[in-house]
Amino acid sequence: MAKKSAVARENKRRRLVEANYKKRSELRNIAKSLTASEEEKENARVALNKMRRDTAHIRLHNRCLLTGRPRGYLRKFAISRICFREMASMGEIPGVIKASW
């Protein structure tokens, strides 16, 4: 099990990213725009720099929904490899069977 504080911090970051995604993407588009003036681009960059770091989606880290484990994450199932193996062997994941050939 991961520390509860680490999981809580990650959840907080996810909420911040969702809340600020639209504003951040608009500012990024202005900063990258070919038609915007240099002053507008500079203002957009300054506004982006003033925003909290945790509002950037790049700071998110995938964690297992069950244990909070940050490594060995399987995106398709949103759980770690260890939880996946346990659940698959117990038949708790529909459509997943042990391979045999």
UniProtKB/Swiss-Prot annotation:
Description of how the protein assembles with itself and partners? Part of the 30S ribosomal subunit. Contacts proteins S3 and S10.
> What protein name applies here?
Small ribosomal subunit protein uS14
- Identify one Pfam family in the record: Ribosomal_S14
What's the family? Belongs to the universal ribosomal protein uS14 family.
Name the Gene3D superfamilies on file.
Answer: 1.10.287.1480
Q: Which keywords does the record carry?
A: Ribonucleoprotein, Ribosomal protein, RNA-binding, rRNA-binding
**UniProt GO MF annotations:** rRNA binding; structural constituent of ribosome
GO terms (BP aspect): translation
Checking InterPro entries in the record gives: Ribosomal_uS14, Ribosomal_uS14_bac/plastid, Ribosomal_uS14_CS
Top-level taxon in the UniProt lineage: Bacteria
- Organism, by scientific name, is Chlamydia caviae (strain ATCC VR-813 / DSM 19441 / 03DC25 / GPIC) (Chlamydophila caviae)
What is the recorded function of this protein according to its Swiss-Prot or TrEMBL entry? Binds 16S rRNA, required for the assembly of 30S particles and may also be responsible for determining the conformation of the 16S rRNA at the A site.
Q: List cellular component terms (GO).
A: cytoplasm; small ribosomal subunit
The protein's matches in SUPFAM superfamilies, at most eight in alphabetical order, are given as: Glucocorticoid receptor-like (DNA-binding domain) (SSF57716)
